[in-house]
C-alpha cells in the first residue's frame, strides 16, 4: 500500500520558503469539536502556495519567459539536442544578461549565468549561434582593438611605470572629455609612473560565447602589458575587471575607484547638493569598488539612499550578455524595472548603465560627472551617443591623447566627399546597427565604380555594397552642398550578379 508513496501527505522537503513578502492571518478557531465547512475553507486559505521563486521575483528575464531554472535547463537541453529544425530556445538563451543575480538568490546554488555561458559556447562551437545576435557588438570590439583605437604608451619621460590606466572602450565612447582629465589626475597623484592603454577587454566575445576570439583579445592585451613592463592595471570599468579576473589572471589590477578613494579627490567644478540612489553594475558584484564608490560619495557630501537590490544583490541595467543587441525589448524590460525601483536620481559608475538609463528618460549621473563635469544638470540627461558617434569619439580620444600628452603627430583620414546623413537615415542606422563608415564606403564605391541606380523621379541614387557578411543599401541625393544620405537598409543575403549567358 505504501510503495512509491513516500512524498504523499505530510513530509519534510528541501524547500526553503521565505515568507517576508507574504501576508499572514490569524489561525482559525474552531467553534465546535471539528471545523465547520466555512471554518475549514478559511483555515485552508491561510496556507501559502509554497513555491521557491526567489530567483524569479527580481528577474524580468525569467518573468518575461515565465520560466523557472529547472524548466529553463530542460529547454536548453532540448535545444542543444536538435539537429534539424527550429531552435525555439535561442531567443530565450540570448535574452539572459548573465548578471548572476539568480545564483545569489538561490539556496541551492543554481546559477543560470554559468548555464547560459556554457550554452553559448556550445552554440558557437556547433555553428548554431545566430550570426545576427551579436554581430555588431563583435565588429565594434574589432574596431576598438584596431589601430584606430588600440594604443599603449608609457608616461612621458618615464622609463619604468608601476601602473597603466585602462579606461575600457565604452567610457571613451560616451564621455570622451573625461579620459585626459582622469589621466592627468592619476599622474598628478601617483609618482611611480602611469602608462595608458586604450582598447576593449573582450567583453563582447565573452558574452557571445566566442572563446577563441576572447583568447586572442586576452593575448593582445597581455603582449602590450609585457612590453610596458608588466604594470598594475587601473581599470575604470567593472566589466573589464570581470574579464581580467577570468582570462588574464597573471595581470594585477585595481579599480579606478579604489585609487580615487585612497588619494585626494579632484577639485569639484559643480556644486554637490544631490539626493541619489546608487545603482551598482552587475559585474561589480562582490568587489571592493562598491565600498570605494560609497566612500567617495560621502566625501563629496551627496545624500545616498540604497535601492532594495544593491551591492551583492544588484540587478543588471539591460546591456549585459549583449541582450541590448540580441533582444531590445528584453533589454528595455531590464532598464524600466531598475528605473521604477528608484525614487531619486540615479548614480552609476558604469558607462553603459548610464547610457541605457538616460535613453529611457531617467536622470542619471556617472561618478565621473560628479568629479569632473562643469554642468551637472546637462550631465544628468546626456544623450546616449549614436553607434557612429561612439566610434568617432574613441578615435578622437586616441588622437587627442597622443597629440596633447605624447606630442605625436596624428594623421587624420581625408574626407573624399562631403557626405551628410538626414534624420530619417540616422534613425534607420541606429535601428539596424549601421555605422557611418560603412555608409561612406557604400557611397564612395557607387561614385568611383558607377555601381548605382538613378531614379529620375526624385533625382536620387540607390547603391549597394557587401562589407564582410552584410549587404548595405544606401539611397542618396547629390546637390551643390555635397551628398545627402536619405535612407539606408541592410541584410545578410548576398546579391550575386550573373552575366547574360548565366541567365540563359
Model-based region annotation:
Residues 1-95:
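Ferredoxin-type iron-sulfur electron-transfer modules and their immediate structural context
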Residues 2-17, 130-144, 256:
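Long, charged amphipathic helices and adjacent flexible linkers at domain junctions
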Residues 38, 158-166, 270-276:
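A short, charged/proline- and glycine-enriched loop
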Residues 40, 263-410:
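Redox cofactor-anchoring modules in respiratory/redox and cofactor-processing assemblies
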Residues 48, 54, 66-251, 382-401:
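Iron-sulfur-cluster electron-transfer modules
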Residues 58, 105, 239-246, 316, ...:
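Phosphate- and divalent-cation-binding pockets in alpha/beta enzyme and binding domains
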Residues 234-235, 347-348, 420:
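Short beta-strand scaffold positions
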Residues 381, 385-387, 392-504:
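Ribonuclease/tRNase effector modules and their secretory precursors
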Amino acid at each position: 500500500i505504501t510503495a512509491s508513496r513516500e512524498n504523499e501527505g505530510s513530509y519534510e522537503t528541501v524547500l526553503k520558503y521565505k515568507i517576508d513578502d507574504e501576508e499572514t492571518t490569524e489561525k482559525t478557531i474552531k467553534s465546535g469539536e471539528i471545523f465547520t465547512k466555512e471554518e475549514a475553507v478559511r483555515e485552508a486559505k491561510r496556507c501559502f502556495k509554497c513555491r521557491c521563486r526567489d530567483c524569479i521575483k527580481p528577474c524580468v528575464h525569467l518573468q518575461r519567459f515565465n520560466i523557472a531554472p529547472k524548466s529553463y535547463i530542460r529547454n536548453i537541453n532540448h535545444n542543444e539536442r536538435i539537429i534539424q529544425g527550429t531552435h525555439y530556445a535561442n531567443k530565450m538563451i540570448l535574452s539572459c544578461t548573465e548578471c548572476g543575480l539568480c545564483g545569489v538568490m538561490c539556496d541551492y546554488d543554481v546559477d543560470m549565468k554559468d548555464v547560459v555561458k556554457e550554452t553559448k559556447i556550445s552554440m558557437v562551437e556547433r555553428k548554431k549561434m545566430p550570426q545576427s545576435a551579436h554581430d555588431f557588438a563583435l565588429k565594434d570590439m574589432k574596431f576598438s582593438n584596431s589601430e584606430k583605437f588600440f594604443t599603449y604608451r608609457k608616461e612621458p619621460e618615464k622609463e619604468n611605470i608601476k601602473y597603466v590606466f585602462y579606461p575600457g572602450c565604452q567610457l571613451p565612447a560616451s564621455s570622451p572629455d573625461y579620459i585626459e582629465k582622469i589621466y592627468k589626475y592619476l599622474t598628478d597623484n601617483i609618482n611611480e609612473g602611469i602608462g595608458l592603454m586604450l582598447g576593449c577587454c573582450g567583453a563582447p566575445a565573452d558574452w557571445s560565447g566566442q572563446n577563441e576570439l576572447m583568447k586572442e583579445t586576452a593575448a593582445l592585451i597581455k603582449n602590450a602589458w609585457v612590453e610596458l613592463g608588466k604594470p598594475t592595471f587601473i581599470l575604470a570599468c567593472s566589466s573589464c575587471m570581470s574579464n581580467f579576473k577570468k582570462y588574464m589572471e597573471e595581470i594585477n589590477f585595481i579599480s579606478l575607484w579604489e585609487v580615487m578613494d585612497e588619494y585626494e579627490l579632484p577639485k569639484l567644478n559643480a556644486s554637490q547638493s544631490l539626493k541619489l540612489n546608487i545603482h551598482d553594475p552587475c559585474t561589480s558584484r562582490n568587489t571592493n569598488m562598491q565600498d570605494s564608490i560609497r566612500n567617495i560619495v560621502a566625501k563629496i557630501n551627496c545624500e545616498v539612499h540604497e535601492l532594495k537590490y544593491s551591492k551583492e544583490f544588484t540587478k543588471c541595467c539591460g546591456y549585459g550578455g549583449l541582450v541590448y543587441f540580441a533582444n531590445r525589448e528584453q533589454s528595455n524590460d531590464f532598464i524600466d524595472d531598475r528605473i521604477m525601483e528608484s525614487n531619486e536620481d540615479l548614480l552609476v559608475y558604469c558607462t553603459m548603465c548610464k547610457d541605457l538609463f538616460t535613453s529611457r528618460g531617467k536622470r542619471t549621473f556617472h561618478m565621473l560627472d560628479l568629479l569632473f563635469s562643469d554642468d551637472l544638470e546637462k550631465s544628468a540627461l546626456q544623450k546616449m551617443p549614436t553607434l557612429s558617434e561612439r566610434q568617432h569619439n574613441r578615435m578622437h580620444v586616441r588622437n587627442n591623447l597622443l597629440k596633447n600628452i605624447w606630442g605625436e603627430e596624428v594623421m587624420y583620414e581625408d574626407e573624399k566627399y562631403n557626405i551628410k546623413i538626414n534624420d530619417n537615415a540616422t534613425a534607420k542606422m541606429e535601428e539596424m546597427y549601421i555605422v557611418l563608415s560603412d555608409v561612406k564606403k557604400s557611397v564612395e564605391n557607387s561614385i568611383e565604380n558607377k555601381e548605382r541606380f538613378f531614379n529620375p523621379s526624385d533625382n536620387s541614387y540607390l547603391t549597394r555594397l557587401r562589407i564582410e557578411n552584410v549587404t548595405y543599401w544606401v539611397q542618396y541625393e547629390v546637390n551643390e552642398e555635397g551628398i545627402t544620405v536619405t535612407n539606408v537598409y541592410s541584410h545578410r543575403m548576398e546579391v550575386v550578379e550573373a552575366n547574360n549567358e548565366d541567365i540563359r
